[in-house]
C-alpha cells in the first residue's frame, strides 16, 4: 500500500447515479486496493425514538448524518488503521447493531448526497466529483430503488420526494457543485467523463508509486 490513500468524493442528488459512477471506478481497478465508503452508513442512531418519529426524519438534511464519526474514521484509515463502519437498517429507520471492518486501502471512494457539504470532509479529498442528473430521471430511479430494495410504498416515496428530497436537493446538495473538480452530466452513461476520470486516478496511483 502507498503511503497516503487517495480519497475520491462522489456526490449528487438522490437517484442521480452516484453509486453507479462509484462502481464504475471500482470495476476499472480490479487489481488495486480500492473500496467505497457510503455516507448513508453514517445516518445517526435513532433507537431512542419511536418508529413513527423515525419515519418522519429528514434524511436529506446534514443533521441526519454523523459526519463527525465519518471524518474520524477516514482519518484513521488515512493513518493506516482499520475501522468498524456502522450500517443502517432502512426498514427500521435506525442504525443496525452490525458493523463491518474496513481495512486500509490505496484508494477510497467516499460517496453520498452531502459529502461535499462539510468543509472538513472536503479537505480530506484529492478528487471531488458531482454527478449531475435531471430531476425526472432521479425521481424515477429513487422510486424503483426504494420500492425494490427498501420496502417502501409508491405513495411514501413520492410524498418524501416532493416534501423533503427535492427541496433539500436545491437547498443543500446542488450548491455543493461549486466545490467539485469534475462535474459528470448524466452519470455513468457519460463514458467519456468516466474514462477521463479513471485515467486521472491511474496517473495519481502511478505517481504515488514512483515517488516512494
Swiss-Prot record:
Similarity section: Belongs to the uridine kinase family.
Annotated GO biological process: CTP salvage; UMP salvage
Example GO molecular function: cytidine kinase activity
Biochemical pathway: Pyrimidine metabolism; CTP biosynthesis via salvage pathway; CTP from cytidine: step 1/3; Pyrimidine metabolism; UMP biosynthesis via salvage pathway; UMP from uridine: step 1/1
Amino acids binding ATP: 12-19
NCBIfam families tied to this protein: PRK05480.1, udk
Gene3D superfamilies xrefs: P-loop containing nucleotide triphosphate hydrolases (3.40.50.300)
Subcellular location: Cytoplasm
Known catalytic reactions: uridine + ATP = UMP + ADP + H(+); cytidine + ATP = CMP + ADP + H(+)
Annotated keywords: ATP-binding, Cytoplasm, Kinase, Nucleotide-binding, Transferase
InterPro entries in alphabetical order: P-loop_NTPase, PRK/URK, Uridine_kinase, Uridine_kinase-like
One Gene Ontology CC term in the entry: cytoplasm
Family matches, as SUPFAM superfamilies: P-loop containing nucleoside triphosphate hydrolases (SSF52540)
Enzyme Commission code: 2.7.1.48
The protein, known as: Uridine kinase
Tree of life domain: Bacteria
Amino acid at each position: 500500500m502507498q503511503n497516503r490513500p487517495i480519497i475520491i468524493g462522489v456526490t449528487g442528488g438522490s437517484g442521480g447515479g452516484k453509486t453507479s459512477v462509484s462502481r464504475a471506478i471500482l470495476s476499472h481497478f480490479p487489481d488495486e486496493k480500492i473500496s467505497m465508503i457510503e455516507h448513508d452508513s453514517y445516518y445517526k442512531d435513532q433507537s431512542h425514538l419511536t418508529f413513527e418519529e423515525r419515519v418522519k426524519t429528514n434524511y436529506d438534511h446534514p443533521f441526519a448524518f454523523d459526519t463527525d464519526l465519518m471524518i474520524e474514521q477516514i482519518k484513521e484509515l488515512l493513518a493506516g488503521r482499520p475501522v468498524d463502519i456502522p450500517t443502517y437498517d432502512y426498514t427500521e429507520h435506525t442504525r443496525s447493531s452490525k458493523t463491518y471492518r474496513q481495512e486500509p486501502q490505496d484508494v477510497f471512494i467516499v460517496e453520498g448526497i452531502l459529502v461535499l457539504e462539510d468543509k472538513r470532509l472536503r479537505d480530506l479529498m484529492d478528487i471531488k466529483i458531482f454527478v449531475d442528473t435531471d430531476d425526472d430521471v432521479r425521481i424515477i430511479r429513487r422510486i424503483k430503488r426504494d420500492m425494490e430494495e427498501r420496502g417502501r410504498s409508491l405513495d411514501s416515496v413520492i410524498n418524501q420526494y416532493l416534501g423533503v428530497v427535492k427541496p433539500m436537493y436545491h437547498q443543500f446538495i446542488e450548491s455543493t457543485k461549486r466545490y467539485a473538480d469534475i462535474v459528470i452530466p448524466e452519470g455513468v452513461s457519460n463514458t467519456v467523463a468516466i474514462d477521463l476520470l479513471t485515467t486521472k486516478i491511474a496517473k495519481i496511483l502511478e505517481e504515488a508509486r514512483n515517488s516512494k
